Every structure is written in structure tokens, then in C-alpha cells.
């Protein structure tokens, strides 16, 4: 089974769960019209990188998709 959570990309509000620091997961940045899909093992760091990118500032929401069954091959 997997879980999907939502965060506020513009305000960098993602939560403080440990899986955000060191867990393989998929994520979707979106604004209702466009989406960017990515994967990372260190999603908090990756979100900081995206937030610094002018191209990614069009997004306002982030969805994290994770599972205890995900591994490095995600």
C-alpha cells in the first residue's frame, strides 16, 4: 500500500515526518494546470532545490507518494 500527502509548495510547508529526509518517494508539483513529476531519496533537499528554481515557482502544491515497500529502485 502507499500513502499520498499534500504540502504547500509556495510556503515550503511539507511537514516534519522523518520520511521526508531520507526515504525514496515520488512527488508531484502542480498548480491546477501544469504538473512536474519527480522522485528523490531526500525529498526535503530536493524541494529546496526546486523552490530555488525560477521555472518551478509556478507551482503551489506538492503531493508526496510513498510506501514502506519503496526502495532505491523507485
Outline where the language-model segments fall.
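GIY-YIG nuclease catalytic motif and its immediate N-terminal context
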Residues: 1-49, 72-73
Amino acid at each position: 500500500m502507499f500513502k499520498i500527502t499534500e504540502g504547500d509548495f509556495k510556503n515550503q510547508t511539507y511537514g516534519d515526518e522523518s520520511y521526508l529526509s531520507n526515504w525514496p518517494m515520488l512527488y508531484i508539483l502542480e498548480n491546477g494546470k501544469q504538473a512536474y513529476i519527480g522522485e528523490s531519496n531526500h525529498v526535503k533537499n530536493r524541494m529546496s532545490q526546486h523552490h530555488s528554481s525560477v521555472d518551478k515557482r509556478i507551482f503551489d502544491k506538492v503531493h508526496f507518494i510513498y510506501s514502506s515497500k519503496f526502495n532505491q529502485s523507485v
